[in-house]
Design a protein with these regions (language model features):
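Flexible, low-complexity segments enriched for small/polar residues
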Residues: 3-6, 11-25, 50-63, 70, ...
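Short, solvent-exposed helix-helix connector turns and helix-capping sites enriched
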Residues: 9, 31-32, 396
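N-terminal accessory alpha/beta regions
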Residues: 23-178, 182-203, 223-237, 243, ...
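A general structural motif at alpha-helix termini
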Residues: 30, 41, 215, 404-405, ...
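Active-site substrate-binding loop specific to GH73 endo-beta-N-acetylglucosaminidase modules
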Residues: 118, 123-138, 145, 152-156, ...
């Protein structure tokens, strides 16, 4: 009886808390399932799988050079085949479309379900021909940016399929979705994956304040929520710009159409989504004041690297953050009734620290984590216990996770979560030891087909996290298709449906009609497809 309980808890540890069991993993967890999770919470160095990837500062530099090459080509008339002809690919919109196609090409060949309509893969090996209107350097730079983006996706899924610390990896993906950015936002496109490895992975076992600051100062978030364009109305930069516009008007010249101003997007989403929650007690005036406090938070330019940025300070050369004092709104701020008299960058940092330790933040984060790991409607007592642990530890995330693990509600036999498409695909990869041969295009197209494209949520709120959101429409039918396609990629030597089911789910669920159905399947491949599509596999129990 005791062994049966431990076996069941081992399956929960690997599937409910982790990302799905690899072959042999349930046996490793069965002696002490809770201890198996606790052991993963010990900080370790980041995986070498990410070591060769460029940091965001390097990507910013490459992107700048790419745009400079494009601009130079446009000024030189490159892309014109003759007098009167329209310039080929000579505007920012078409350029962005081409970069987007390089970053998210369709799989070539393979199952038709992988080939999402409208997505076609360009030949990234082909240099520009003399007649295509683009200089070779321009195409080379675009290919390098695209390769960098694909390398990040490849590393992410190679790691998730092989890691022995799948609980920590699930936590990483939880926070990545909590601080969601989307590749659909052009300026943020190249930085979504780097943000996960640069801002989230190093702090997932640390303090929430450090995690929060790292994310909110990352180029991905600053660009996604438009803070790079936020300028204080009374800032030095705004004053100079206004004076210049007045001189232009006096000389009879047209003023620029785009005007400088405050952008509230980042401040609002930090309060509503990242910390306090929508019912966290803040008002519009708090959002405005906070937005003023973080004016000047921007991204590195080449001149900042060379020490000639003038108004730039507080630069993080690896992640690409910079504080521009000339764009910062001067003066004191009042947020949630507290006065902040700090100067410059320190003002926004002080507000972030207080938001991180606010009781509403403790409640909001605890509810989301409990919902992610236990149930769509988690027990209020569990949420309250986690919120208390968060506050008494002053935002220590490991203490928060430990409280979750040690709570009896988290191990209830009735607790379960329906897998998101990403959860489903990753758990199949782990159960079937499936690799994508350093080419993640088939994988990304599969997730697109299932409704969860990689780093592309529909809003800053991230991907939904309840069963109702993922079971609607034709989602279940698409999972059956995906199960069949993924079963094809399992090595022949591992195509034993019953053994695979027991290794991934434990022996307890693999009985009766379910086990009989796996044995009666027309072929081992069909049996694996039946396993992957089964309710037992689709739920994190």
């Amino acid at each position: 009886m005791r062994d049966a309980i431990k076996a069941s808890q081992a399956a929960s540890a690997a599937n409910r808390f982790g990302l799905g069991a690899k072959p042999g993993e349930l046996a490793a967890a069965s002696n002490d399932p809770r201890g198996w999770l606790h052991q993963q919470l010990r900080p370790t160095s980041l995986s070498t799988v990410f070591a060769a990837l460029p940091n965001s500062s390097d990507i910013l530099q490459r992107e700048y050079e790419y745009k400079q090459t494009k601009r130079a080509g446009k000024q030189a008339g490159i892309g014109q085949s003759g007098p009167g002809n329209a310039q080929v690919e000579g505007n920012a919109a078409s350029d962005a479309r081409k970069l987007r196609r390089h970053e998210r090409p369709a799989a070539q060949g393979g199952d038709t379900l992988m080939q999402t309509p409208g997505m076609r893969a360009p030949d990234m090996r082909r240099d520009a021909s003399p007649s295509d209107g683009e200089p070779p350097e321009f195409k080379r730079q675009r290919r390098e940016l695209a390769r960098s983006a694909w390398a990040d996706i490849d590393a992410r899924y190679r790691w998730v399929a092989s890691t022995d610390a799948s609980f920590v990896e699930r936590l990483t993906r939880f926070w990545s979705n909590h601080f969601a950015v989307s590749v659909d936002k052009g300026p943020a496109r190249l930085y979504a994956a780097p943000m996960e490895r640069e801002a989230i992975r190093p702090h997932v076992l640390g303090n929430f304040n450090d995690l929060l600051l790292a994310v909110e100062t990352h180029p991905a978030m600053l660009r996604y929520l438009d803070n790079v364009a936020s300028v204080g109305a009374d800032s030095i930069f705004a004053t100079r710009t206004e004076q210049r516009m007045q001189r232009m008007a006096a000389q009879g010249n047209a003023a620029p159409k785009r005007k400088l101003g405050l952008n509230e997007n980042l401040a609002r989403e930090i309060m509503e989504l990242h910390t306090l929650g929508v019912d966290g007690g803040y008002k519009q005036a708090d959002v405005v004041e906070f937005a003023r406090a973080i004016t000047g938070w921007g991204t590195l330019m080449p001149r900042d690297r060379q020490g000639s940025g003038g108004d730039a300070s507080g630069a993080n050369i690896s992640t690409g953050f910079v504080f521009r004092d000339a764009a910062h709104e001067p003066g004191e701020r009042v947020v949630l009734g507290k006065r902040y008299a700090q100067d410059g960058q320190a003002q926004g940092q002080a507000i972030l620290r207080d938001l991180a330790l606010h009781p509403a933040t403790a409640q909001h984060l605890s509810l989301k984590i409990a919902r992610h790991f236990v149930a769509d409607d988690p027990p209020p007592a569990l949420v309250a216990r986690m919120a208390h642990a968060y506050l008494v530890s002053r935002g220590d995330l490991t203490h928060l996770y430990t409280t979750l693990i040690d709570s009896p509600e988290a191990w209830s036999p009735t607790a379960r979560k329906f897998k998101t498409p990403d959860d489903f695909v990753v758990s199949v990869m782990r159960a079937g030891d499936i690799a994508f041969d350093r080419d993640p295009r088939m994988l990304t197209q599969l997730l697109e087909h299932l409704g969860q494209p990689v780093f592309n949520p529909r809003s800053p709120a991230g991907y939904p996290d309840t069963a109702a959101d993922w079971m609607a429409g034709d989602g279940l039918w698409k999972r059956i298709q995906a199960a069949e396609a993924l079963a094809d990629r399992v090595a022949v030597a591992q195509q034993n449906p019953v053994a695979a089911a027991q290794a991934s789910l434990g022996a307890e669920p693999v009985t009766g009609d379910f086990a009989a159905g796996l044995r009666r399947a027309g072929s081992p491949r069909e049996g694996l497809a039946l396993l992957f599509a089964s309710p037992a596999f689709q739920w994190r129990a």
